[in-house]
Design a protein with these regions (language model features):
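Polybasic/polar functional segments that serve as interface/processing modules
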Residues: 1-118
Length: 118
């Protein structure tokens, strides 16, 4: 379910390690206080533990929170290590993360913006 989660308008990841003993209330408080974001929006917030083999997702679904949890049996997520930072992911970066790849792919084509017809 977490690999193909498409219900959210935005996806944020909390860089660095998060204490995954936190539940819904603790993670929602972290989103509000540390990152100054609103957890009551159509947004998926992702958190990773120290060993990088487990992630938790927090998602508000109009009438309550959903807490998603995934533990890899082998391998680890390529999680950004910079502490106390939150990053917005594109859908492509989210797929890369769920596939075990780094969210910054140096060989990927970058989107082109600001073009005009000749």
């Amino acid at each position: 379910m977490l690999n193909d989660f498409t219900g959210a308008d935005k996806v944020y990841i909390a860089c660095g390690c998060t204490d995954l003993r936190k539940g819904i209330d603790g993670l929602a408080r972290l989103v509000q206080q540390q990152f100054e974001l609103d957890p009551f929006t159509n947004t998926l917030f992702l958190f990773c533990g120290r060993r990088r083999d487990r992630i938790k997702g927090l998602y508000w679904e109009k009438d309550g929170f959903i807490l998603l949890y995934k533990r890899l049996e082998q391998g680890a997520y390529q999680w950004p290590r910079s502490e106390s930072e939150v990053k917005t992911l594109t859908q492509q970066q989210y797929r890369w993360l769920m596939e075990g790849l780094q969210i910054e792919q140096p060989k990927a084509h970058r989107p082109v913006t600001g073009l005009s017809a000749v």
